[in-house]
Amino acid sequence: MKVKSGIYQQIYEVVRLIPEGRITTYGTIGRIVGCSARQVGYAMASSPPKQGIPWQRVVNRQGCISLRSHGSPDPRQRILLEEEGIDFDHKGRIDLNRFLWQEVE
């Protein structure tokens, strides 16, 4: 369990770096910390609610909000992103060219 906890903490540290009004993908976070996009998704689903982790800023590689276990996107995520000034197109996608956060090298 310690390994999982350690990688989750690394994921949370990177997610905290994403500035307001920007998003990134599960895969990008995974490449930064050395894990799979799926593991990043698990970490986001497990993130402690009161630790200031901006989980809403992580989306899938198409720029869409990923489906949750119940088969629908979390409507709170879209609301939070729109409050940060992020726009969605008519298909529910975010323009990655406009809003994608590029990690600092």
Task: Locate each region found by the language model.
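Nucleic acid-binding interface residues in structured DNA/RNA-binding domains
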Residues: 1-105
